[in-house]
Amino acid sequence: MKKIVFAFCLFWVMATKASGQDVGLSFSYFIPRNGDFSTPISPFSIRGLGVNLNRFVALQTGASLYRMAGLSIIDTPLESNHSLLGPNFTVLVPAELVIQLAGQQVQLDLKAGGFFFYGFDQQLNYGNIDRAIKSLKNWDLANANLSYENNPGFGYHFGTELTIPFSNQLKISLEVNYLVGTAPLPLKGNYSGGNFNSPSETIAVDFKDAKVDFTGLEFSIGLIFSGGNGAGGKGVRGRGRKR
């Protein structure tokens, strides 16, 4: 955990220097499919760093550290509308192509690209896993004992950002992204259980195709403080926002 925090602090310092034109503060949240509402670990998030290829096209990246309350696990026999993994910490690093449509008063950015993510300090949600097993086997009682193999994940995303100026130095940004990603999470172990007044049984499992489902909606609202020097064209894109 200390190494992750140090890496983010170093990235934050470098990114702040690189994005000296515009810096800001925003609050970002992630709503996963069949998961639980998640929040960022402030201030370990900065997004919108990149290079303007021309007036209309830019390449952007960044990094965010999320506290995931719960995520779904897919590609197993266990079916659940609730989170089976979490809580954990997740590092998210996007890379995106941005189409910049600037009007006289507002700017609309259209974004699409891919992302890398990695969850650490993982915990299986045995309460929901046991309930999924009971539903699968039609049992009254179930108790799972599983181990997992953690892996990084990848996916794609698309979204839009609306930037509205209030003055030469202050803007407000509203951003929404839809993310679709998975990370391999093979599960091994066993589960035991049965019905009342019946002998219990133990079943070995090997869910080698299990994956973390990182699909959901990310949205943020923030303030951007401009240095007032509206440099254009190629160069480092000055839109870094610390979330």
Predicted segments, located by residue:
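Predominantly the C-terminal beta-signal and adjacent terminal strand-loop region
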Residues: 161, 165-243
